[in-house]
Structures are given as structure tokens and as C-alpha cells.
Amino acid sequence: MLNVSIVLYNPDWKQVTTLTRALLECSHVRRIYWVDNSPTLQEPPVLSNQVKYIFNNQNLGYGAAHNIAIRESIYDDIPFHLVVNPDIVVTSDVITTLLQFIQQHQE
């Protein structure tokens, strides 16, 4: 089980939606956080109740924005959290392989 965070700034919603749909196909993904550092509130598409949109109303920076989602994962006792950029391409088998590797190499 893992959560995923994607930091956004004036996002290309088509790109974000494509990535999010691919992540949602993976049974290991519990929640996806869209953390938006854009200067104005955007109307995000609704894809799933597994996606949480967080609008910061300012550009906190890449790391600080991901930390918001990571804190939620810690609070929810999710053992793993994946930090990704919105322009990557993934498949569910990649997430499964990554999670298996992490579980086998926790040192």
C-alpha cells in the first residue's frame, strides 16, 4: 500500500489526468494527492475519491508541497509514499515492481 503526491503549478490537466488514471489502475495505490502551488485556484477534474486536491494559494516550493501530502500519509499510517512529477509515464506493473523492491530492501 502506498500514496502518491504530484505537485502542480498551472497544470496541464490532460497530462495530470493521464498520469493519475495510470496510477489508479494499480491496486497498491491508496490515495493520490494533487498539491497545487498555482497562484489561482483551478477547477480540477474529478476522477476518483482516491484523488485529493490541495490548493496552497501560493508557491510553497516543490519539497514543501510534497511534504504536505507526505504528512497525510504518515498520519494515515501508510508505509510508503511515492513522489512523482506530472510529466512521467507509468504503468501499474512498474508501481508493483517498485513496491516489491522497496519491501525487500528496507534498509
Task: Briefly describe each language-model feature range.
Residues 37, 56, 84-86:
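Active-site acidic Asp-centered loop
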Residues 29, 78, 105-107:
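Short, high-confidence coil segments that cap the C-terminus of an alpha-helix
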Residues 11-25:
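Short, well-formed alpha-helical segments that are part of the catalytic scaffolds
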Residues 57-75:
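Glycine-rich, basic loop-to-helix element that forms the pyrophosphate-binding segment
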